[in-house]
């Protein structure tokens, strides 16, 4: 009998072992769909991004009008742009839900997979930030100015670092061209890191809602989870296309319809919604360096998750106190997101400070304490 090409060919064998004959826990819920959804997001963003890059001009005098030209004169240019801009929002929705799932079900105990995932999040944030600068509207320009300026808080080398990043003494043409180069490069870096992420995941196999070893029960990925993933794709692409076609500017800032002007500061400088929680934490500390450190810590704290796990059970499925704390954390993140979009005035300042304090307290102090407490309760 001739050998099965799918199982013998060096390249097809790898694809087969990753997507077809992969042993998968039978009880993984819809929360395990977000990994593949992120893959679809990445592919969609790279495709629409390539098509947009073909019509974009990375020059301060032409960038804004080249984007307008794409929307007006290129066949379906408006659709490509709207899908790309809103696709970024869906990318972040999926990654935040994916991280939340990992946190709830203790997936961070696969340390390598978790750490590469956090690096992926940081790369995605960098990509989204440099991408937001490219249309060269008011919020693009001032967002770039404010965020790059944060590096000047680094003692001794800060100012030099900022001028080196800018390619001059302010955000100008060199900044725009290098941001375009970075925005083109980073998604391919994300794709490469994704393969590393998957390699580490397939070393251990997937976690499951019970957090127990499921080797004896595993089923093949295809057809069960390929079909489940296709359902996930349709359920994500439907709201994405709806948003892109019916209200494409819902999540954008109206300021960005005004071309960048270094002489006029917008009354309200704020990032896109997916950065607002971190922006609120940054603003809650009146000291520049302190704010920058808190901003960095708000995301880098994820690296500590495996070390803060004190419970005997892996997942929160049977840990009601941890569940309560988890949902308080989620609510707290919503509050931070809302505060980040508000002006810096009373009562938003104090709300932001309390929410930021709560965020770090829950993650660093309360989760380990509750985990240890639940261990004690198991003995009674």
Curated annotation (Swiss-Prot):
<keyword id="KW-0812">Transmembrane</keyword>
<protein>
    <recommendedName>
        <fullName>Cytochrome b</fullName>
    </recommendedName>
</protein>
<keyword id="KW-0999">Mitochondrion inner membrane</keyword>
<dbReference type="InterPro" id="IPR005798">
    <property type="entry name" value="Cyt_b/b6_C"/>
</dbReference>
<dbReference type="GO" id="GO:0046872">
    <property type="term" value="F:metal ion binding"/>
</dbReference>
<dbReference type="GO" id="GO:0008121">
    <property type="term" value="F:ubiquinol-cytochrome-c reductase activity"/>
</dbReference>
<feature type="binding site" description="axial binding residue">
    <location>
        <position position="84"/>
    </location>
    <ligand>
        <name>heme b b562</name>
    </ligand>
</feature>
<dbReference type="InterPro" id="IPR048259">
    <property type="entry name" value="Cytochrome_b_N_euk/bac"/>
</dbReference>
<feature type="transmembrane region" description="Helical">
    <location>
        <begin position="348"/>
        <end position="368"/>
    </location>
</feature>
<dbReference type="InterPro" id="IPR036150">
    <property type="entry name" value="Cyt_b/b6_C_sf"/>
</dbReference>
<dbReference type="InterPro" id="IPR048260">
    <property type="entry name" value="Cytochrome_b_C_euk/bac"/>
</dbReference>
<dbReference type="InterPro" id="IPR005797">
    <property type="entry name" value="Cyt_b/b6_N"/>
</dbReference>
<dbReference type="Pfam" id="PF00033">
    <property type="entry name" value="Cytochrome_B"/>
</dbReference>
<dbReference type="GO" id="GO:0045275">
    <property type="term" value="C:respiratory chain complex III"/>
</dbReference>
<feature type="binding site" description="axial binding residue">
    <location>
        <position position="98"/>
    </location>
    <ligand>
        <name>heme b b566</name>
    </ligand>
</feature>
<dbReference type="InterPro" id="IPR016174">
    <property type="entry name" value="Di-haem_cyt_TM"/>
</dbReference>
<feature type="transmembrane region" description="Helical">
    <location>
        <begin position="321"/>
        <end position="341"/>
    </location>
</feature>
<feature type="binding site">
    <location>
        <position position="202"/>
    </location>
    <ligand>
        <name>a ubiquinone</name>
    </ligand>
</feature>
<keyword id="KW-0479">Metal-binding</keyword>
<dbReference type="GO" id="GO:0006122">
    <property type="term" value="P:mitochondrial electron transport, ubiquinol to cytochrome c"/>
</dbReference>
<keyword id="KW-1133">Transmembrane helix</keyword>
<comment type="function">
    <text>Component of the ubiquinol-cytochrome c reductase complex (complex III or cytochrome b-c1 complex) that is part of the mitochondrial respiratory chain. The b-c1 complex mediates electron transfer from ubiquinol to cytochrome c. Contributes to the generation of a proton gradient across the mitochondrial membrane that is then used for ATP synthesis.</text>
</comment>
<feature type="transmembrane region" description="Helical">
    <location>
        <begin position="114"/>
        <end position="134"/>
    </location>
</feature>
<dbReference type="InterPro" id="IPR027387">
    <property type="entry name" value="Cytb/b6-like_sf"/>
</dbReference>
<keyword id="KW-0830">Ubiquinone</keyword>
<keyword id="KW-0408">Iron</keyword>
<keyword id="KW-0349">Heme</keyword>
<feature type="binding site" description="axial binding residue">
    <location>
        <position position="197"/>
    </location>
    <ligand>
        <name>heme b b566</name>
    </ligand>
</feature>
<feature type="transmembrane region" description="Helical">
    <location>
        <begin position="227"/>
        <end position="247"/>
    </location>
</feature>
<feature type="transmembrane region" description="Helical">
    <location>
        <begin position="289"/>
        <end position="309"/>
    </location>
</feature>
<keyword id="KW-0249">Electron transport</keyword>
<comment type="subunit">
    <text>The cytochrome bc1 complex contains 11 subunits: 3 respiratory subunits (MT-CYB, CYC1 and UQCRFS1), 2 core proteins (UQCRC1 and UQCRC2) and 6 low-molecular weight proteins (UQCRH/QCR6, UQCRB/QCR7, UQCRQ/QCR8, UQCR10/QCR9, UQCR11/QCR10 and a cleavage product of UQCRFS1). This cytochrome bc1 complex then forms a dimer.</text>
</comment>
<keyword id="KW-0496">Mitochondrion</keyword>
<keyword id="KW-0679">Respiratory chain</keyword>
<dbReference type="InterPro" id="IPR030689">
    <property type="entry name" value="Cytochrome_b"/>
</dbReference>
<dbReference type="GO" id="GO:0005743">
    <property type="term" value="C:mitochondrial inner membrane"/>
</dbReference>
<feature type="transmembrane region" description="Helical">
    <location>
        <begin position="179"/>
        <end position="199"/>
    </location>
</feature>
<dbReference type="Pfam" id="PF00032">
    <property type="entry name" value="Cytochrom_B_C"/>
</dbReference>
<feature type="binding site" description="axial binding residue">
    <location>
        <position position="183"/>
    </location>
    <ligand>
        <name>heme b b562</name>
    </ligand>
</feature>
<keyword id="KW-0813">Transport</keyword>
<feature type="transmembrane region" description="Helical">
    <location>
        <begin position="34"/>
        <end position="54"/>
    </location>
</feature>
<feature type="transmembrane region" description="Helical">
    <location>
        <begin position="78"/>
        <end position="99"/>
    </location>
</feature>
């Amino acid at each position: 009998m001739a050998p099965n090409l799918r199982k013998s060919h060096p390249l097809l064998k790898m694809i087969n072992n990753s997507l077809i004959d992969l042993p998968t826990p039978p009880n993984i819920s819809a929360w395990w769909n977000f990994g593949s959804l992120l893959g679809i997001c990445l592919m969609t963003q790279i495709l629409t991004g390539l098509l947009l890059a073909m019509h974009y001009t990375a020059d301060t005098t032409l960038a804004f009008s080249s984007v307008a030209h794409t929307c007006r004169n290129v066949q379906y240019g408006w659709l490509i742009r709207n899908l790309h801009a809103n696709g970024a929002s869906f990318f972040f929705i999926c990654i935040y839900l994916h991280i939340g799932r990992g946190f709830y079900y203790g997936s961070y105990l696969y340390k390598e997979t978790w750490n590469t995932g956090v690096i992926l999040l940081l790369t995605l944030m960098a990509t989204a930030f440099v991408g937001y600068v490219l249309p060269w509207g008011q919020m693009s320009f001032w967002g770039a100015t404010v965020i790059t300026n944060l590096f000047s808080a680094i003692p001794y080398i800060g100012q030099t670092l900022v001028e080196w990043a800018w390619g001059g003494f302010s955000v100008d043409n060199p900044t725009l061209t290098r941001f375009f180069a970075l925005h083109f490069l980073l998604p391919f870096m994300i794709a490469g890191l994704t393969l590393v992420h998957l390699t580490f995941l397939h070393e251990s196999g997937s976690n499951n809602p019970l957090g127990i070893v499921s080797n004896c029960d595993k089923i093949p990925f295809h057809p069960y989870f390929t079909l489940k993933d296709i359902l996930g794709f349709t359920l994500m692409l439907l709201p994405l296309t709806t948003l892109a076609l019916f209200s494409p500017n819902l999540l954008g800032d109206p300021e960005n319809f005004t071309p960048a002007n270094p002489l006029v500061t917008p009354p309200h400088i704020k990032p896109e919604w997916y950065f607002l929680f971190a922006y609120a934490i940054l603003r809650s500390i009146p000291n520049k360096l302190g704010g920058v450190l808190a901003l960095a810590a708000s995301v880098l704290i994820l690296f500590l998750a495996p070390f803060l796990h004190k419970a005997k059970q892996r997942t929160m499925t049977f840990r009601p106190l941890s569940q309560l704390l988890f949902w308080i954390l989620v609510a707290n993140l919503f509050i931070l997101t809302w505060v980040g979009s508000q002006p810096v005035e009373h009562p938003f300042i104090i709300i932001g400070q309390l929410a930021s304090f709560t965020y770090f307290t829950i993650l660093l102090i309360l989760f380990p304490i509750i985990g240890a407490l639940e261990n004690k309760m198991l003995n009674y």
